[in-house]
Every structure is written in C-alpha cells, then in structure tokens.
Amino acid sequence: MNSLVLHRIGVALTCTFFISVTTLAAEPAALRGYNAAIGDSSVSGISSGAFMAIQFATAWSSVVKGVGVVAGGPFWCAQADAIDVFTNYQAPLWHATGSCMVGPPLDLNIFVAKAAEKAASGDIDPLKNIGRQKVYIFHGFNDAVVAKSVTDAAAEFYRHYLGEANRGNLYYQTAIGAGHSLVVLQE
C-alpha cells in the first residue's frame, strides 16, 4: 500500500470515530429561565465583541435597550453576509481586518443603506428602534489596533438614527489615554 492510501484510510477511520462519539453524546441540559424582561436587554463588547454588539443591537433593535461599544465600528463594517464568506471569502476578510480596523475613514452611507435594505426585507428589526437605545462608545486615544476613524463611524451611525431629539442617548468618550483596552477605575 502506498502512503496516499494509508492516509485516506486514516482519515476515514478518524472521521468514523468522531461521528460515532458525537452520536453517543448526552443531550445537553435545558437552560433555566431568569424571568428577565427581554425589552430591557443590553449588549456590549470590546474590539471584535464591540463590532458584534453593534450588529446585534441593530438587528434586534426592538429588544435592545442599551449598547456598550469599546473600540468597535459601525453596522455591516465588514460589508459581508454569511453567504459572502463562501462566494468571495477574501473581501470580507480584507474589510474586517483592514478598513474596519485601521481606516481609511468609512463611508456612513454604505452602512445606512445596507441597514435600510436589511430592515425593508425584514432581515432585521425596524431601524426606528435604534433611536430609543442608550449608547456608550469608547475609544482610547492611544489605541493602535482600531483606528479612531472606525469608532467615529460607529458614533456617526448612531447619530444618524438617534436624530437631534435623542442625541443625549449617545455618550462618546475619546479623551482618555488608553490603548486597546477596557478602562477600569482603580481605587
């Protein structure tokens, strides 16, 4: 037998083993409820988690009351849907690790148009809900990972939907000399 045949047999046996083990796994225990009011939910994150917090808060704006963003960018910053990863895998990766992290300044119109398209098709909640959210955005001025222009775009995205009447719902902090980090109070 040559090494290619042995390799294929090894792969087949390994796959068979893992398939048989996963079919024997016990059912996971059900999570218990906490009687939390779904409409009082908030979401927050730092860095990639901040990007995801904005995705979630925009998509599920009817249930998200507050958003905390530390070094994150606007909705749909990577400019890709799940299917795009399979059809053009390099473009989403470039946006996510390129323009969504280090700039150049982002075009707000792209993100607003995509949000409107998604809301019109029913893929995400109506965008008017964003206007009632309380939003905290932080960017340390020594952050060398996510450019301030990217976090500025997140703030502009929210300003667009908050409008003049709800401008007070956004607090954007950029005056602290922090790096790419979550700042805590030291006592």
Residue ranges and their predicted role:
Residues 1-11:
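Bacterial N-terminal signal peptides that target proteins for export
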Residues 27-38:
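Conserved acidic catalytic loop of the alpha/beta-hydrolase fold
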